[in-house]
């Protein structure tokens, strides 16, 4: 059978595994802000393990370090800075609403 006649066969692509985000020399500590800040979203939330590509043990240690840094006020609990500009309000074309009795 020709290869052109096999439409559902997947082509083999080279797969390159990503490097882990935490190296073997990195210490997971509440004082290591450059490491901790990589695992926090823009809103100040702890990113999930799937997003971080961490092992279960690393994620637990990162979570504990982030919580300790928050308690010691090295990190904010929330990041409430406005990231967007509010668009101008569009005026209504209809009159004021009246209540039906």
Curated annotation (Swiss-Prot):
<comment type="subunit">
    <text>Part of the 30S ribosomal subunit.</text>
</comment>
<dbReference type="InterPro" id="IPR018275">
    <property type="entry name" value="Ribosomal_bS18_CS"/>
</dbReference>
<dbReference type="InterPro" id="IPR036870">
    <property type="entry name" value="Ribosomal_bS18_sf"/>
</dbReference>
<keyword id="KW-0699">rRNA-binding</keyword>
<dbReference type="GO" id="GO:0006412">
    <property type="term" value="P:translation"/>
</dbReference>
<dbReference type="GO" id="GO:0005763">
    <property type="term" value="C:mitochondrial small ribosomal subunit"/>
</dbReference>
<keyword id="KW-0150">Chloroplast</keyword>
<keyword id="KW-0687">Ribonucleoprotein</keyword>
<dbReference type="GO" id="GO:0003735">
    <property type="term" value="F:structural constituent of ribosome"/>
</dbReference>
<feature type="compositionally biased region" description="Basic residues">
    <location>
        <begin position="1"/>
        <end position="19"/>
    </location>
</feature>
<keyword id="KW-0934">Plastid</keyword>
<dbReference type="GO" id="GO:0009507">
    <property type="term" value="C:chloroplast"/>
</dbReference>
<protein>
    <recommendedName>
        <fullName>Small ribosomal subunit protein bS18c</fullName>
    </recommendedName>
</protein>
<dbReference type="Pfam" id="PF01084">
    <property type="entry name" value="Ribosomal_S18"/>
</dbReference>
<dbReference type="InterPro" id="IPR001648">
    <property type="entry name" value="Ribosomal_bS18"/>
</dbReference>
<comment type="similarity">
    <text>Belongs to the bacterial ribosomal protein bS18 family.</text>
</comment>
<dbReference type="GO" id="GO:0070181">
    <property type="term" value="F:small ribosomal subunit rRNA binding"/>
</dbReference>
<feature type="region of interest" description="Disordered">
    <location>
        <begin position="1"/>
        <end position="26"/>
    </location>
</feature>
<keyword id="KW-0689">Ribosomal protein</keyword>
<keyword id="KW-0694">RNA-binding</keyword>
């Amino acid at each position: 059978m020709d290869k052109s006649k096999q439409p559902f066969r997947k082509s083999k692509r080279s797969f390159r595994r990503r490097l882990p985000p935490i190296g073997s020399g990195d210490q997971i500590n509440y004082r290591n802000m450059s490491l901790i800040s990589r695992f926090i979203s823009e809103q100040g939330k702890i990113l999930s393990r799937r997003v971080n590509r961490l092992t279960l043990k690393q994620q637990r240690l990162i979570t504990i370090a982030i919580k300790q840094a928050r308690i010691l006020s090295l990190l904010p609990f929330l990041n409430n800075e406005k990231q967007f500009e509010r668009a101008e309000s569009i005026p209504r074309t209809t009159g004021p609403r009246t209540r039906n009795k």
